Amino acid sequence: MSTWPEVLGALVAGSDLSADQTAWAMGEILSGEATVAQIAGFAIALRAKGETVEEVSGLVDTMYALATPISVPGRLLDIVGTGGDRSMSVNISTMSAIVAAGAGARVVKHGNRSASSQSGSADVLESLGIRLDLPAARLAEIAAEVGITFCFAAAFHPAMRYAAVPRRELGVGTTFNFLGPLTNPAHAHAQAIGCADPRMAPVMAGVFARRGVDAWVFRGDDGLDELTTTTTSRLWWVHGGEVRETSVDPADLGIARAEAGALRGGDAAHNAEVVRRLLAGETGAVRDAVVLNAGAALAVYDEPGSAPDQALVAGVERARESLDSGAAARVLDRWVAATAR
């Protein structure tokens, strides 16, 4: 059994905590037992010290223990970014999820409303006509019927509401900002995760490795929480409990360099229209970014043990075919219809 003075004292002294200690702290927070001051102190002290794989794993373990369960058969894929890059870009991961589903992956996307941008994944999906208030059993059925479903984080991790006030009042990013992509409630087997924070990206990769998940964690060298098309990206490739690091250059895949402004988005209605134009066949910088990120997701889903440069070539080709054949557009149409029933 830990205590708050013990946990906070260790963090203030710069000492690392065990997974058991962070799991205890998260249990206090998510049960409503921790005070606002204790939650804020823990969040800031852990962030200031710098998180370890073991510490974040303890937080993740507790979140999973208290999450609303959802059971979806088959090999599952999630594509999500941490946010926080302040790029105000279009919803690349959401579009990539639809394209990956069009290519045959079974996608269970875990996401939330916007925190630091104008439109989060939940916001744009609502604007596209997808209902978010369905029970877990129906969401699982939709995944099987359509090939994609969406788990709204607030519904599947309801105990996180206890951390909402201190997080909002702090007004700065903390470790909590990185937990959503690590806690897909369907326990997706393959994950393509964008992380804007260069310190946290390898930590997130380590958490996936510890859990035995196949994952690609990446960060654009321009700071984007995606595989970027404006320059190169760093990639942490997770398979078999091991993490390897490499780089991705879109030029190697025949993708032209883009200007940063070409990926800038707007509010949910604007970004939903960008999705529709992409699926209708519009070419350009947005399509290139989506093809690259959907290709990465398909690579980790289909070929997790292959070298990234080889798997990415095949993944990008499948992503292009998903768009060009109309398969991705049909996925969205079926998804909207399925959530309306």
Swiss-Prot record:
Keyword list, A-Z: Amino-acid biosynthesis, Aromatic amino acid biosynthesis, Glycosyltransferase, Magnesium, Metal-binding, Transferase, Tryptophan biosynthesis
Return the PANTHER family for the record: ANTHRANILATE PHOSPHORIBOSYLTRANSFERASE (PTHR43285:SF2)
Q: Which domain of life is it from?
A: Bacteria
Which cofactors must be present for this protein to function? Mg(2+)
Q: Which reaction does it catalyse?
A: N-(5-phospho-beta-D-ribosyl)anthranilate + diphosphate = 5-phospho-alpha-D-ribose 1-diphosphate + anthranilate
Q: In which pathway does it act?
A: Amino-acid biosynthesis; L-tryptophan biosynthesis; L-tryptophan from chorismate: step 2/5
Q: Which Pfam families match?
A: Glycos_trans_3N (PF02885), Glycos_transf_3 (PF00591)
**Family recorded in the similarity comment:** Belongs to the anthranilate phosphoribosyltransferase family.
The record's annotation in InterPro entries points to: Anthranilate_Pribosyl_Tfrase, Glycosyl_Trfase_fam3, Glycosyl_Trfase_fam3_N_dom, Glycosyl_Trfase_fam3_N_dom_sf, Nuc_phospho_transferase
Enzyme class label: transferase
The protein, known as? Anthranilate phosphoribosyltransferase
Presence of the UniProt keyword Lipid biosynthesis in the record: no
What is the gene name?
A: trpD
